[in-house]
Amino acid sequence: MSQEKKVFKTEWAGRPLIIETGQLAKQANGAVLVRYGDTVVLSTATASKEPRDVDFFPLMVNYEEKLYAAGKIPGGFNKREGRPGEDATLTSRLIDRPIRPLFPKGYRHDVQVISIVMSVDPDNSPEMAAMIGSSMALAVSDIPFEGPIAGVNVGLVDGELIINPDVQQREVSVLDLQVAGHFDAVNMVEAGAKEVAEDKMLEAIMFGHAEIKKLVEFQQSIIDEIQPVKSEFVPVEVDADLESKVEQLSESFGLSQAIQTQEKLAREENITAIKLKVIEAFEGEDEAVITAVNKKFDALIKEEVRRLITEEKVRPDGRRPDEIRPLDSEVGILPRVHGSGLFTRGQTQALSVATLGALGEHQIIDGLGVEEEKRYMHHYNFPNFSVGETGPIRAPGRREIGHGALGERALLQVIPDEKEFPYTIRVVSEVLESNGSSSQASICGSTLALMDAGVPIKAPVAGIAMGLVTKDENYTILSDIQGMEDALGDMDFKVAGTKEGITAIQMDIKINGLTEDILREALEQARVGRLHIMEHMLSTISEPRAELSQYAPKIEIIHINPDKIRDVIGPGGKKINEIIDATGVKLDIEQDGTVFIGSSDASMIEAAKKLIENIVREAEVGQIYMATVKRIEKFGAFVEIFPGKDALVHISQIALERINKVEDVVKLGDQFLVKVTEIDKQGRVNASRKVLLEEEKKASEEK
């Protein structure tokens, strides 16, 4: 890597983009500083000196958010950043996916790409700056890399597509799309959308790719000037005779027939049996030979699966390319929860459970941006037993977080506004069985659970995972991919949406990129599959239940004068805590005076409502109230006309005749009717007993 500082400038979506090399992190294999407006990200790439003896590429991508970038001090006792938050984890995945396919096949050196956000400008995406920085750090290093790549955000505001929308534009955009790729093709897509049609989504993807091309050209100009020297990578030589023998043995033992076993576990058992027979033929050979045999056998499985799909249009389980596995679904299978849905597609099964809570139970997101409140959450769990394996039970990893976020994006678009449905909603999807497309099964199960819970979603959402197998110029697009097709194919393209359009998509590929034609065909085939799945789901439950579960909290909304909010809360929260302690309800008060009262006990809601109404109740001039004497002074008596509201009855207004002492007529605790005669500018209430006595005397005389 060059040790001389160099600065390169261009414009990106109307804002300055600056890439600096040669000054920072000079012991990394590659490092760049990316400035996009006032957003600054340091990206580094480092590789191990020697390769690892593993059968996968050990790439680790880390995106780190430093709170100093936003002028914040971390909370907690230590005042340090802790483990990455969910957004940082998702961004790490976002960067990983487009760069992973661009390393040489068989490369086994550990590679770590780290992007540290050092300054953040809300209008200029640190995520996209980190993606460019990661690409450039690899490109200027000696690490073999077939980039550069770039990524952009695309919004859709009033029918117009926008590159890298600012904060205000993002708030009104019906599309939140991230696209990445190299000059020739797109290789990563992630989006949340408000029922955007397939043709508009494709237009947005290609619109983003046009901008990506400009960024790639800019990066290439930097590479051409720096001229990094790449380390030589020589793939491990293969033993042609050994591979030929493995191929012949596998064919003779019926590998192709074993691959076409319909049931997953039986297929795995049949393939394993053949593998053991092949290994037996090499009995007595050293470990290196057995490793080579295993590697070739796995390669043969991949080749045969791909051949069957591309040439014979037959999938391992016998389905046509566009055929969806058998579907089954149920709702309401758990008696005490607020809503539940079980969705099964072939050998993939997800149980989703919906829980409703008060608005105050929302999740607070305090990252680099403005503090946000999240009232809809979707969590995805993938236990070992779902694939018939054992292992330690750990906290959710990147995959679980990513799949949960995808499901959240897919359904967030149809969740009703809090004014219409004043609840915090959490859905947990437990994958009970998996043979591919489990994230999409969790979306379908979550829709069922929400409808079972009585959440008035705007429209049901279904999800499907599409696959792709390419061979030379030919390709086959697969609907509803299973695990083997995901592992051995070229694409995992997840599409979720309603009947009207897409609400979320996520695309990962293992080849360099996809053309516009393949994307168009995949989106259309996904639409047809999604509608087929939707039809089945609606046959199970056609619309959200009219009533909530008896175990769900009931929430009543009342409106108070915003000026009275402080009275309800009281000094230091004293008043509101008294109400909560007395009734056990959950209270949430909005700045506009909207009060949400939640409890599973309707009588307690009513009790809390009365307490609040008494606090905010306004006295009215001319109204008559039953008053209770609370305090006596020389100049009059202070009476309570209703809970929380006192009035002064002046000594001159207590009796018909003139009195010398208040105590001569009334005592503490006495009750009598008074009429409110005045409310001054400070809100103090004056009342009269005398006025009512005069009216009573007059009425008596008239009789």
UniProtKB/Swiss-Prot annotation:
GO cellular component, one term: cytosol
Annotated CDD domains: KH-I_PNPase (cd02393), RNase_PH_PNPase_1 (cd11363), RNase_PH_PNPase_2 (cd11364), S1_PNPase (cd04472)
Family note: Belongs to the polyribonucleotide nucleotidyltransferase family.
GO-annotated biological processes: mRNA catabolic process; RNA processing
Residue ranges of every copy of the KH domain listed in the record: 553-612
Gene3D superfamilies assigned: GHMP Kinase, N-terminal domain (3.30.230.70), K Homology domain, type 1 (3.30.1370.10), Nucleic acid-binding proteins (2.40.50.140)
Keyword Cytoplasm: yes
Enzyme Commission designation: 2.7.7.8
Function: Involved in mRNA degradation. Catalyzes the phosphorolysis of single-stranded polyribonucleotides processively in the 3'- to 5'-direction.
Name under which the protein is recorded: Polyribonucleotide nucleotidyltransferase
Catalysed reaction, written as an equation: RNA(n+1) + phosphate = RNA(n) + a ribonucleoside 5'-diphosphate
Domain named S1 motif: residues: 622-690
GO MF annotations, alphabetized: 3'-5'-RNA exonuclease activity; magnesium ion binding; polyribonucleotide nucleotidyltransferase activity; RNA binding
Binding site for Mg(2+): 486, 492
SUPFAM superfamilies found in the cross-reference section: Eukaryotic type KH-domain (KH-domain type I) (SSF54791), Nucleic acid-binding proteins (SSF50249), Polynucleotide phosphorylase/guanosine pentaphosphate synthase (PNPase/GPSI), domain 3 (SSF46915), Ribonuclease PH domain 2-like (SSF55666), Ribosomal protein S5 domain 2-like (SSF54211)
Keyword ATP-binding: no
Organism ancestry: Bacteria, Bacillati, Bacillota, Bacilli, Bacillales
Group of enzyme by EC: transferase
PROSITE patterns in the cross-refs: KH_TYPE_1, S1
InterPro entries assigned to the protein according to its UniProt record, in alphabetical order: ExoRNase_PH_dom1 (IPR001247), ExoRNase_PH_dom2 (IPR015847), ExoRNase_PH_dom2_sf (IPR036345), KH_dom (IPR004087), KH_dom_type_1 (IPR004088), KH_dom_type_1_sf (IPR036612), NA-bd_OB-fold (IPR012340), PNPase (IPR012162)
Alphabetically ordered keywords of this record: Cytoplasm, Magnesium, Metal-binding, Nucleotidyltransferase, RNA-binding, Transferase
Annotated localization: Cytoplasm
Cofactor(s) demanded: Mg(2+)
